[in-house]
Structure formats: C-alpha cells, structure tokens
C-alpha cells in the first residue's frame, strides 16, 4: 500500500468530499470513525485534559486551531497538528435551548461548571408558593416567565453561565428570605391571637368555677341563676356576653366584654373565698360539734347515766364501765350492749353517728334514769323514742365478739395489760349475768304463782307489772 495515499478513501471518509492530491499534503493519522457525534466539545474534553482551559479563550481562537490553507491550493497544511487538535477542528455546535427543557438541562450539564445543590436548587418554598402573602409581589406566571428568561440559551464558554447562575441564585435567595420572614411574622401573629383567646377563655372558666364554688353555700337562688353563654366550638371567639335574668327587668345583654388581648392583660378580680363571704354556721363546724359532744360525754360520765358514746379518757372510761356494770338491768340485750361499749383488741366497732346539739339535749332529757339491779322496772322494755337501739348488724357483730371472748380460754396475750383489764371485766359481767338470770327465773316463778291466785271480788285486779314492782322494791329493801 502506498504511504502517500490516505487510509480512508473518498467514499469511506466521514468528512465528505475533500480534494486529494498535492505533494505538500500530509495526510492525517488513522482515526476511529464513530457513526454519530452528539457533542464535539464533550469528546474533546474526554481526550484532552487541557481542553476546558483552551475553550475558555473562545472557539475561534488561533491558539487552538492552527490549520493553514495555502492560497495556491485548496488542501490544508497541518505541519504540527495532533490527533486531538485535528478532532477538535470543527467549532462546537450547541443545541438550541428553545427546543425543549431537556435540551436546556443537557446544555447546562455540558457547559456549566459544577455548582452546589443550594445554588442550583434553593431549599424551601419558592415565592410563587406564597403569592397570597405579598400584595406587592408580581403574578406567579410572570415570575416563572422571568425565571425562564434568566436561564441562558446559548453558552459559548463557561465563564458567563457561572456568573449568570450565581446571580440568579442570589436573586432567588433574597425573595426566599423575605417570604420566610413574612411567613414567620404571619404565624407569630396568628399564634398570639390564638394564645390570647385561649387564655381569656381559661380565665373566664376559672372565674366561673370560683364563683360557683363560693356561691354554693352563700348565694341565693336568684343570684345563682347568673350564667354566661359558652364560647364557640373552636375556642377562638374573643368576645362573650353575660346575661342576668331578673323578674323586674327584662332580659337584656350587658355591654360586650373587651377583646381577648385587653381581657387577658387586665383580668377582672376573682371573687373572695367562701370563708370570707359567709362564715360557717355552728352546726356545720366540726370543731364545734366535737366540743359539744365532749361536753355531753363528760356530763353523762359524771352523772353515771347510760352514755351512748363512750368517753375518750381511759380513766373516765374505766369509771363509767364500773358504774354501768352496777346500774345496768340484768337483761341479755343489755349485756350485749355492754360488750359493744367495751373495746376489743381483735376488732373495732363502728362509731355511732353524732347528733346535733338540739337532738343531743333531747336525748339526754328523754333518757330514762338508771335502774337498780333487780328492780321490776328493769324487766319492762324501754320506750322506743327514748332508747337509741343499735342496728341489727351491730348487735350481730357484738354477739360474735362476745361468743369469741367466751370461747377463749384467756391464754393468748397474757402480758397485755389491756387484755387483762378486759378479761377482768368479762369475768365480772359473766358473774352478774348469772345472778341476773337466777333472779329473773325466781321473779318469773313468783309471777306465775301470783297469776294462778284469784283476787277477791271487791278489790280491783292487779297487773303483773305492779306486782313485779312491789316484789322488786321488797328485794331492794332486803338487799340494803
């Protein structure tokens, strides 16, 4: 093969028809043929590292393209061209950016220098997203059109697109900051209004609750009828109207309250507590009740009467128990009640409900006097109004405790002084119970004998109660 001939023939040359043929023509070196070249500048950048630096001077710079075409012939003379310079001889053709959006992004990817994401795509919302917040802002469509116009369509070199990108990014960041500030101010103002309205509503509710608490024991029904309309469901209503129903005056609304900010800043003074407005009555004072009950207990203990509440002092309790043991009637029910009054270490009986001072005085006056042991009056049941009989549950509980005490042999807790006293009282009560049962059986036998004897016709019939009373008086006289 002749070296003077080119490697590729005219038919196979991708560069079109070129005149061949002069002795001073140096053919180019062997080149690989690619069927389609999208961007000569991209292939040039991949082949030559210094290509971007050379492109910065311009595509028509004589430093890069050193081809010389003698005037005597139409063939080029390339005395010192390299393969990369031969490949980069045609001027870079840019894709028209007006064709499509993809072409614009391709041009920017090829020509522009690398930039950060913050400069290319600012974070956060754009001004067009909040166009209703700014009255002097232009139309969103014009903003988008202006943004599209700011993008350069053709970039012959990389210095100008970089400056344009930086400028457009700075212009985009400034409105973004303004929008953020306006948005923050708008949110803060809305938050302040909502907070103030909620605070005013809470103040109204607190005032209403305090008024209801203070007026529960001191206000009259006409005063207690004052009410306020509830606020709206969203809780953001800054106004409220209060209505006071009155029989002499018609229903008329008061002047509306001040708005929520003013109401929150200057709240109305809360009503005074109930203790300062209306003091408690003596009947409602627990200390007064306790003092009256203590005085009544002491008076009953000193007189030796049958007390329905045991004294609190141990000495008085022992004295009252000793007096009651001598003065109680010899009945089974009275023994059970006595066991109730005696405290037990295993269980504690429920205290009786305290009465008012008037009822306590009535009870003291109406209580029957103490009967002597063995008197006939002890057999008669007392009137139901004068005796506060305990409930059936208390009687059953007392019976259970008494049965448990009788079943015990006294060997448990022998060193306990309280149990020793209680056991001594239990032994005394058992002895008195046996004596009372014996006397009761004797009296009943005598009553049966007297009932079988018929009185004379002239004398009026005598009742068994009168006979038992006379027998009791005689027995008491014998005992004394």
Swiss-Prot record:
InterPro entries xref list: PROSER3 (IPR037646)
Location of region: Disordered: 1-94, 111-166, 207-310, 336-392, 448-480
Cellular component GO terms held in the UniProt record: centrosome; cytoplasm
Biased composition regions of type Basic and acidic residues, renumbered to the chain: 469-480
Low complexity compositional bias, start-end: 38-50, 67-83, 134-147, 211-237, 255-279
Modified residues (Phosphoserine): 408
Top-rank taxon: Eukaryota
Coiled-coil features, chain-numbered ranges: 419-451
Keyword tags: Coiled coil, Cytoplasm, Cytoskeleton, Phosphoprotein
Keyword Iron tagged: no
Subcellular location: Cytoplasm, Cytoskeleton, Microtubule organizing center, Centrosome
Matches recorded under PANTHER family: PROLINE AND SERINE-RICH PROTEIN 3 (PTHR22045:SF6)
Protein name: Proline and serine-rich protein 3
Organism: Homo sapiens
Upper lineage: Eukaryota, Metazoa, Chordata, Craniata, Vertebrata
């Amino acid at each position: 093969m002749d070296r003077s001939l080119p490697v590729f023939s005219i038919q196979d040359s991708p560069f079109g028809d070129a005149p061949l043929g002069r002795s001073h023509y140096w053919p180019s070196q062997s080149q690989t043929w690619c069927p389609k070249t999208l961007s000569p500048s991209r292939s040039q950048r991949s082949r030559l590292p210094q290509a971007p630096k050379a492109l910065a001077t311009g595509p028509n710079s004589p430093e890069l393209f050193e081809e010389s075409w003698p005037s005597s012939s139409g063939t080029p003379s390339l005395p010192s061209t390299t393969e990369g310079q031969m490949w980069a001889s045609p001027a870079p053709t840019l894709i028209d950016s007006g064709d499509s959006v993809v072409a614009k992004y391709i041009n920017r990817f090829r020509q522009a220098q690398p930039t950060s994401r913050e400069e290319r795509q600012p974070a956060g919302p754009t001004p067009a997203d909040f166009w209703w917040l700014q009255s002097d802002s232009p139309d969103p469509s014009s903003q988008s059109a202006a943004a599209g116009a700011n993008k350069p369509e053709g970039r012959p070199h990389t210095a100008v697109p970089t400056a344009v990108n930086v400028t457009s990014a700075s212009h985009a960041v400034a409105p973004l900051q303004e929008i953020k500030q306006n948005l923050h101010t708008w949110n803060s103002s809305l938050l302040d209004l909502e907070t103030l309205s909620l605070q005013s509503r809470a103040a109204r509710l607190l005032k209403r609750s305090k008024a209801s608490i203070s007026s529960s024991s001191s206000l009259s029904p006409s005063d207690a009828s004052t009410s306020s309309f509830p606020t709206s469901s969203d809780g953001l209503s800054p106004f409220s109207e209060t209505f006071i129903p009155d029989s002499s005056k018609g229903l008329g609304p008061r002047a509306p309250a001040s708005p929520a900010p003013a109401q929150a800043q200057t709240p109305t003074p809360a009503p005074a507590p109930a203790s300062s407005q209306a003091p408690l009555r003596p009947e409602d004072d627990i200390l007064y009740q306790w003092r009256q009950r203590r005085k009544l207990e002491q008076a009953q203990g000193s007189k030796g009467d049958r007390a329905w509440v045991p004294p609190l002092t141990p000495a008085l309790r022992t004295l009252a128990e000793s007096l009651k043991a001598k003065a109680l009637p010899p009945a089974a029910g009275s023994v059970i009640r006595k066991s109730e009054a005696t405290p037990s270490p295993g269980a504690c009986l429920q205290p009786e409900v305290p009465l008012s001072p008037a009822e306590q005085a009535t009870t003291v006056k109406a209580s029957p006097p103490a009967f002597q042991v063995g008197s006939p009056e002890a057999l008669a049941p007392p009137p139901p109004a004068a005796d506060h009989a305990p409930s059936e549950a208390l009687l059953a509980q007392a019976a259970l405790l008494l049965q448990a005490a009788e079943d015990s042999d006294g060997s448990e807790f022998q060193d306990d002084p309280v149990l020793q006293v209680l056991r001594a009282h239990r032994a005394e009560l058992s002895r008195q119970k046996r004596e009372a049962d014996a006397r009761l059986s004797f009296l009943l036998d005598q009553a049966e004998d007297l009932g079988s004897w018929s009185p004379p016709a002239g004398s009026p019939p005598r009742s068994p109660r009168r006979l038992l009373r006379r027998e009791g008086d005689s027995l008491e006289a014998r005992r004394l």
